[in-house]
UniProtKB/Swiss-Prot annotation:
Its main location: cytoplasm. Gene3D superfamilies: QueA-like (3.40.1780.10). GO terms for biological process: queuosine biosynthetic process; tRNA wobble guanine modification. It is found in: Cytoplasm. Disulfide bonds: none annotated. Belongs to the QueA family. Its EC number is 2.4.99.17. Monomer. Pfam families: Queuosine_synth. InterPro entries: QueA, QueA_dom1, QueA_dom2, QueA_sf. GO terms for cellular component: cytoplasm. This is S-adenosylmethionine:tRNA ribosyltransferase-isomerase.
Length: 355
C-alpha cells in the first residue's frame, strides 16, 4: 500500500488553533461503516447514538508540560521535549539545538534558566537527561515547562492550554499530546451518558511525540511505528467481556484507546482480551482485523498519517476518504482542537485494500 493513497487536500483555514468555547459544542460527523452513510450534527448527539449497556473506553492519560526552553552551558539555545519520564530525576527527550549536546554536557533550563540538568547519553533520536534538582521531574515540568501543542497549531502555548489541552477525566501524567477525541467530553455530557446507562472504562496510553511524526516511507508496510506505554487493567478487561456477553458495543474514545484495546487483544491467549501493561508499537492499517472495537469516536487526522490509516482499517478506505472529502467541503474544523467523528465498524473493511 502506498502512503500517498491517504492524502487529501486540506485548506489551512480548516486547522483549528483554539477549541470551541464549550467542550461538547463541536460538530459531529457520523459515518455508518456498513453502508458509508454520513450524517451531520453536534457532539451532544452522541448521547442519542449510544444504547444503554454500551461501553465507552476512555484514555485517562494526562498531558505534562513537556516542552522546555533553555541553553547549553556552552552558550547555544536549546529546546527539550520530554518523551518519557524514567524516574524522579531522569527523562528521555527530543532535543533541538544548532548542535546536539554531547554526553556530560550541562544544560540551563527554563525561561529563566534556573534549573540545571546534564545530558547523560543518547539513545538513537532520544537524549537521556538528568535534572540536578531536589524536586521530582513532574514538579520541575509543572514549574518551567510549556504545554506541548502540536506543530500544526501555529502559536505559542497559553496558560489556558494547561486546562483546555487536557481531558476533564485525565488522571495519570505522562503524555506529551492529548488524546484529543476525549477533549469534547464535559461533565454534563458524562453525567447524561451515565444516567442513560452507558458504561465507562479507562485505559492509559501515554501519547508520545511520535504521534505527530510524518510517515517518511513510500510504502506503508515499511513504516516503523513508535513505541508508547499502555495499560489495560483487569477491570477494563472485565468490562469489555461483560459488554460483549450482553450483546452491546465497545466504543473507543480516540485512536489511543483503540491501540490500547487492540494491543491487549493481540497479547491475549485463548480469550478475546487480557490485561496489558507495557510498550505497544501496534500499527493498524487496511487489512487489519479488529478484534474488540465496535464503534469509534475520533477527531479528523492529518493526511498520510498513521491515524487516518487506522480509521480506514475500521470504516473502510473508500468510506473514510469520502467522509474526509465531505468534511472539507462542509468546513469541519480539523486536528486536535477541531471537530469529531462517530464511526461504526465496517465488517468488510479488512478486505478493502487501496491501490
Amino acid at each position: 500500500m502506498r502512503v500517498a493513497d491517504f492524502t487529501f487536500e486540506l485548506p489551512e483555514s480548516l486547522i483549528a488553533h483554539y477549541p470551541q468555547a464549550e467542550r461538547s459544542g463541536c460538530r459531529l460527523l457520523s459515518l455508518n461503516g456498513s453502508d458509508g452513510a454520513l450524517t451531520h450534527g453536534v457532539f451532544t448527539d452522541l448521547l442519542h447514538k449510544l444504547n444503554p449497556g454500551d461501553l465507552l473506553v476512555f484514555n485517562n492519560t494526562r498531558v505534562i508540560p513537556a516542552r522546555i526552553f533553555g541553553r547549553k552551558a556552552s552558550g547555544g539555545k536549546i529546546e527539550v521535549l520530554v518523551e518519557r519520564m524514567l524516574d524522579d530525576t531522569r527523562v528521555l527527550a527530543h532535543v533541538r539545538s544548532s548542535k546536539a549536546p554531547k554526553p556530560g554536557s550541562d544544560l540551563l533550563l527554563g525561561d529563566d534558566e534556573s534549573v540545571q540538568a546534564t545530558m547523560l547519553a543518547r539513545h538513537d533520536t532520544l537524549f537521556e537527561i538528568e535534572f540536578n534538582d531536589a524536586r521530582p521531574v513532574l514538579d520541575i515540568l509543572n514549574s518551567i515547562g510549556h504545554m506541548p501543542l502540536p506543530p500544526y497549531i501555529d502559536r505559542p502555548d497559553e496558560d489556558a492550554d494547561r486546562e483546555l489541552y487536557q481531558t476533564v477525566y485525565s488522571q495519570k501524567p505522562g503524555a506529551v499530546a492529548a488524546p484529543t477525541a476525549g477533549l469534547h467530553f464535559d461533565e454534563p455530557l458524562l453525567v447524561a451518558l451515565r444516567e442513560k446507562g452507558i458504561e465507562t472504562a479507562f485505559v492509559t496510553l501515554h501519547v508520545g511525540a511520535g504521534t505527530f511524526q510524518p510517515v517518511r516511507v513510500d510504502t506503508i508496510e515499511d513504516h516503523i511505528m513508535h513505541a508508547e506505554y499502555a495499560e489495560v487493567p483487569q477491570d477494563v478487561v472485565d468490562a469489555v467481556l461483560a459488554c460483549k456477553a450482553r450483546g452491546n458495543r465497545v466504543i473507543a474514545v480516540g485512536t489511543t484507546s483503540v491501540r490500547s484495546l487492540e494491543s491487549a487483544a493481540q497479547a491475549a491467549e485463548n480469550t478475546l482480551i487480557a490485561p496489558f501493561f507495557g510498550d505497544t508499537k501496534i500499527f493498524i492499517y487496511p487489512g487489519y482485523h479488529y478484534q474488540v472495537i465496535d464503534a469509534l469516536v475520533t477527531n479528523f487526522h492529518l493526511p498520510e498519517s498513521t491515524l487516518i490509516m487506522l480509521v480506514s482499517a475500521f470504516a473502510g478506505y473508500k468510506h473514510t476518504m469520502r467522509a474526509y472529502q465531505q468534511a472539507v467541503a462542509e468546513q469541519y474544523r480539523f486536528f486536535s482542537y477541531g471537530d469529531a467523528m462517530f464511526i461504526t465498524r465496517n465488517p468488510q473493511a479488512f478486505a478493502e485494500i487501496p491501490g
